[in-house]
């Protein structure tokens, strides 16, 4: 039977109309009508930081395909007895996709469980399109990302009035590179709240580049496995970022949060200021 589902990503890029079978469902819809595979964000690590929708998808799964190198086993254990568990740390996309397609075509509820949020460094597009090519729809369940968990653990805000109003999520170039316009030097020039994933292996060059654009005493939060039982989190001056990382032997599951906001927590937002009017609180 010919596929009736088209890749929504290709349709956008090629300016084609989307097939109704893969149109994005309204946010209020708790159960996607056409989906047979759910790509679910597991959040930063702690099971109680799952969204309710993510937890429900996992508990209802017949097949759980999960990133066992990054997702907490406690989260995978939420799946029902009898659920087929497939660990993907040693598999390629060419091995994972056919498995999901096979199970979904049998009418089973398949959950692809990713760490953090699937929309960030989650190989999402190739999975969505690969499933669509096989006539299988997808729904994506967001997850809390490491930068949010880190800011929460620090009890801090990343957007401070008069200091910084922009958050940048990126990574060091590394083996796979980044587009030239998004190199770290260009991003650092913004002096925004800069959240760096997948960068611990390159911390020396990262620090060198950042010091060209941020003061050397700019606070840097270094977070390792934030929200896991073995979480380690410390704020250090930018000039010590590499040394501390290397002392701790951090090479993976590490987030760097570089931000002037970490040093300016006393500033007040206008949102609740008596002098600030808005639609719901007009001038008195």
Regions found by a protein language model. Give the residues of each.
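Residue-level signal for well-ordered alpha-helical positions
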Residues: 77-78, 153, 209
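Residues at the C-termini of beta-strands that transition into short coil/loop
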Residues: 68, 89, 142-144, 173, ...
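Short phosphate-engaging motifs
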Residues: 71, 146, 202
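Class I S-adenosyl-L-methionine
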Residues: 2-141, 149, 242
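A contiguous loop/helix-start segment that scaffolds small-molecule binding in enzyme catalytic cores
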Residues: 2-39, 95, 106-110, 129, ...
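Class I SAM-dependent methyltransferase SAM-binding "motif I" and its flanking Rossmann-like core
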Residues: 46, 117-190, 234-235, 284
């Amino acid at each position: 039977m010919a596929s009736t589902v088209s890749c929504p990503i290709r349709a956008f890029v090629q300016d084609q109309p989307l097939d109704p079978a893969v149109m994005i469902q309204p946010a209020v819809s708790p159960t996607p009508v056409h989906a047979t595979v759910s790509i679910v964000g597991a959040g930063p690590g702690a099971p109680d930081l799952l969204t309710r929708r993510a937890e429900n998808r996992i508990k209802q799964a017949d097949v759980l395909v999960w990133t066992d190198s990054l997702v907490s086993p406690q989260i995978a254990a939420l799946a029902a007895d009898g659920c087929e568990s497939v660990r993907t740390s040693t598999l390629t996309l060419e091995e994972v996709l056919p498995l999901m397609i096979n199970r979904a075509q049998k009418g089973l509820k398949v959950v692809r469980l990713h760490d953090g949020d699937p929309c960030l460094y989650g190989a999402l597009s190739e999975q969505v399109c690969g499933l669509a090519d096989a006539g299988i729809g997808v729904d994506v369940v967001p997850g809390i990302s490491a930068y949010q968990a880190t800011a929460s653990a620090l009890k801090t805000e990343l957007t401070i009035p008069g200091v910084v109003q922009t958050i940048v999520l990126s990574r060091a170039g590394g083996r796979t590179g980044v587009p030239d316009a998004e190199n770290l030097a260009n991003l650092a020039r913004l002096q925004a709240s800069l959240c760096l994933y997948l960068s611990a292996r390159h911390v020396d060059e990262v620090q060198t580049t950042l010091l060209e654009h941020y003061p050397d005493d700019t606070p840097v939060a270094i977070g390792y496995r934030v929200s896991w039982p073995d979480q380690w989190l410390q704020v250090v001056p930018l000039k010590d970022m590499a040394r501390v990382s290397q002392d701790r032997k951090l090479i993976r599951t590490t987030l760097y949060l570089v931000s002037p906001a970490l040093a300016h927590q006393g500033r007040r937002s206008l949102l609740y200021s008596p002098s600030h009017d808005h639609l719901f609180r007009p001038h008195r």
